[in-house]
């Protein structure tokens, strides 16, 4: 599977630029979508961090609170080479709330904390707000045109390269695991590897759909359609194709692609045939998902950034902000704008 083979919705960018020349050029703020309950056995802690990864902070919080590392959870991994505001959840049944003013960790600041009744689980976010700075942008006019297109039409909802590990190593491990060349016993490592494989297969289907149709909004018979912003889906019936196409055009519905696993794909007819053909050479990876009892799921192929705003600090420096639903990647927005030149700071999560 070629991770570099990902099509563009608006054509390959002609402009180039630099992302993450400094951590301050990439700011992420988690949006839980709710306020803490104010009571309960869980303690929600919001921190601002820079220069350290999510698991490192979670382990430090566990040590500070005197609890096992497994009793600290979070909704998602955040890049160490960025400024991020992130929530952690400490399970403290019958325990006194620790004085987090005394918590010290280089690059980390505790912003607030409150009791809550439910554990914070992976993916349990409404979304993330991003503020980015692109530097050394080579063609302001071309980028401006693409910003208008992205505002109106959106971008492919690809998983970003950080999902696959450095140089795609997580996917390579998945392929070796699927071929019975290695065994993976560590639970967290298994999760990363399986996630990388599913994400790569999703990206492949999206890219193939773009190559065939030039669009991610043209409904096929049997497509699995999702209410925009919702997780559940239903199958497009042939008799309803015209009305469903209109709802997709109006951004009420999104066409989905598979996150392969055990269970049905969720599509039928033409859509199912297309997905099976797209992943025809990935039988070993799909079998691995089934063997490891990873539930099949669906994910929207298109995402439209909300509240997309931008300003030019000068002709080569673009400041932009936008909001994406949980699981969508800011780097997938940027790749439709510019060809990113290498910087010294690359994502590791």
From Swiss-Prot:
Catalytic reactions on record: uridine(13) in tRNA = pseudouridine(13) in tRNA
Domain TRUD: 154-303
Gene3D superfamilies the UniProt entry points to: TruD, catalytic domain, TruD, insertion domain
Active site location: 79 (nucleophile)
Domain of life: Bacteria
PANTHER family linked to this entry: TRNA PSEUDOURIDINE SYNTHASE D (PTHR47811:SF1)
This protein's name: tRNA pseudouridine synthase D
Gene: truD
